[in-house]
């Protein structure tokens, strides 16, 4: 499986090396714990039966919870965001500014998850960066190929949700902030 988001300083480069060190028995019977999951590229490549994905970033952990609990709501929200993005580049900066609103913390978790994915897909190099006040501040990026950016990724979201919800698997999320 492929990640839904890009993550700077991720473990994608080390996947093949790490896969050689982990036995199938470990993946079948052990609990895989990833304390700094980021895009979860390593966990998704390994696909353990039991895993705990953790991170300090509560918005990041929220997207995984929403992918598990409400994938269709997330996809619907992302479709709406894609259409709004195509109409105006100002839309990016409006969405980016949501975290400056004092109501952001109480915002619907699906809206926050779709915001995170939208910004990740449309900002410069998918770089998650916040300023000293904790506000997301990466500027708008451009597709280097000139092709439209796949903001929605419904196939990836559904595949990941199916894996998270498979009764043979135990997948939990922890935010350590």
For each of these PLM feature ranges, what is it?
Residues 28-85:
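Conserved S-adenosyl-L-methionine
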Residues 2-22, 26-27, 71-177:
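SAM-dependent nucleic-acid methyltransferase catalytic core
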């Amino acid at each position: 499986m492929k990640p839904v988001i890009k993550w700077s300083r991720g473990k994608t480069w080390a996947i093949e090396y790490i896969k050689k060190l982990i036995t199938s028995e470990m993946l079948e019977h052990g609990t895989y714990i990833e304390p700094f999951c980021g895009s979860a590229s390593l966990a998704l490549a390994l696909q353990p039966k039991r895993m705990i994905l953790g991170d300090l970033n509560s918005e990041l952990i929220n997207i995984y919870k929403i992918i598990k609990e409400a994938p269709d709501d997330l996809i619907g929200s992302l479709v709406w965001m894609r259409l709004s993005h195509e109409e105006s580049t100002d839309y990016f900066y409006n969405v980016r500014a949501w975290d400056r609103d004092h109501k952001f913390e109480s915002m619907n978790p699906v809206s926050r998850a779709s915001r995170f994915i939208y910004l990740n897909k449309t900002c410069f190099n998918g770089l998650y960066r916040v300023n000293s006040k904790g506000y997301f501040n990466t500027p708008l990026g451009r597709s280097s190929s000139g092709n439209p950016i796949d903001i929605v990724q419904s196939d990836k979201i559904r595949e990941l949700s199916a894996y998270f919800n498979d009764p043979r698997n135990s997948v939990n999320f922890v935010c350590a902030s």
